[in-house]
Amino acid sequence: MKDAPLHTLNDYECPEGEAYYFPVDDASLRIAFWNLESQKGTIFLQSGRTEFIEKYYEVISEFVDRGFAVAMMDWRGQGLSSRIARNQRIGHVDKFETYDDDFMQVMNNCFKEKCPAPFIGFGHSMGGCLLTSYFISSDNIFD
C-alpha cells in the first residue's frame, strides 16, 4: 500500500491517524485508520454518497476519545479514491455492485487484518446501505 494524504479542513484538524491507497482491481481506494492500539475494538465508519474522509473528522475524534479504533475509506469515485470518469470531479461507477465488491475486498484483505476486534459498523446514507449489504454476506466479519 502507498501512503495517502489526510487534509486539514478549515474548522477541523485531522485527528492523528494514517492513510493509504489500497489497490482493488484497476482502482486505488483511499483508506484511513485511527487509534489502532485500541483494546475496545474498531468502528468501521462509512460515508454517504459524494462524501469523503475529511468530512468525518469530528465524528472520528469522538470515537477515538471514547477509546475506539476507527477505519474508513473513500468509495470509488469519491474523495481521493480513483475515478473512472474523464472529468475527475465527477464521481461515477459502472454499477452499484462495484461499491459492494470494493468494500468486500477492503474489509477482508485489509481492515480485518489491521484492525482490533470486536468490529462495529457505523454508516451514513449510502455507507449504511453498503454496510447492510456486507452484514448479510457470507464473509461478514462483524460481531
Regions found by a protein language model. Name each.
Residues 40, 46-51:
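Active-site glycine-rich loops that stabilize anionic/oxyanionic intermediates
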Residues 53, 60-86:
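Conserved alpha/beta-hydrolase
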Residues 114-125:
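Alpha/beta-hydrolase fold nucleophile elbow
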